[in-house]
Amino acid sequence: MPAHMTHFAIKLGLALTLGLSFLTTPLKAAEQVNVYSYRQPFLVEPLFDAFTAQTGIEVKVIFAKKGLIERIKAEGERSPADVLLTVDIGRLHAAREIAQAVKAPILQQHIPAIARGSDDKWFGLTWRARVAYVSKDRVSERQLRFADLADEKWRGRICLRSGQHPYNIALFAALLDHMGEADFRKWLIGLKGNLASKPSGNDRAQVRKIYGQACDVGIGNTYYMGKMQTNEKSPEQKDWAEAVAIVFPSTPRGGAHMNVSGMAMAKHAPNRANAQRLMEYLVSKEAQKIYAEVNFEYPIRGDVAASDRVASWGTFTPDTIALDTIARLRKRASEIVDETGFNAGP
């Protein structure tokens, strides 16, 4: 090949190489943020649409019911994940090993200290209370303590999902902290003796059991009431919901047990600045209001009101235990559930 052609080929090859490199640089990434979400699409897509409209940043989402933390671990430094959205303090605590600390004054300002990690690796987005669903016809009490549920008057009247489910383990961990191990174990044995049957089903199944008169009191998260009340695909759930009232049992030091949905920034987030912008947006008044309307949960911000439907379920004082404390005690609470044979039923 003539020298001038060789020179041209080298220049062309270099140009193509630089061009391909340019296409894989963060130019496009700077206009997007990648979210791995355990939360269902209909819950978060209105938020992402509003964020994109406001900022021009495209939100790309991977939805899954399980395995996202493990996926991020497996992807390692090449992971495209920027933000993880999940529910329950157990999952948020587990996400710390794939997360990085975020020092953002906006997050510190609007998220209570008890609802974010002391290491700044996870942040609550919404509150959900774990409550008693009680039969309107067969239960007169509209105020209860969790301690009351071990009283003999409730023998054969309580229904519950598996004691090992993360929602119950979080509740039990909180009560373990409140009561101390000896009294908590005694209480759990009393609750076990009051079960109407072996723990089974999900939270809504407990309400169905109350409707069917299989029990009088069930334990569940508040937002399931909203899901049942508005369920057009399974309208029979509206009848279940109509059969019960929500009662907010208090913990021994006072206050209803609370858990959260939340977020974390992935350790190797390729779009860190955009990830932080999204996280900050999700605690804005606009986003908190959208979230509250869509998912029947309580805003993490104290200056944003719950939706009218959620507010109609009643007022309560939340427990002030730090969720980090609940996370720390989850393992021991789970062990005690096994040691007492709780899941074997009464």
Give the location of each predicted region.
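Ligand-binding pocket segment of bilobal, Venus flytrap-like solute-binding proteins
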Residues: 174, 178-249
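A structural signal for short loop-to-beta-strand junctions that line the ligand-binding cleft
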Residues: 79-84, 100-132, 147, 158-160
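A bilobed periplasmic-binding-protein/Venus flytrap-type ligand-binding module shared by bacterial periplasmic
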Residues: 133-138, 258-271, 290-293
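Early extracytoplasmic/lumenal segment of secretory-pathway proteins
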Residues: 30-94
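Periplasmic-binding protein-like
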Residues: 157-164, 281-302
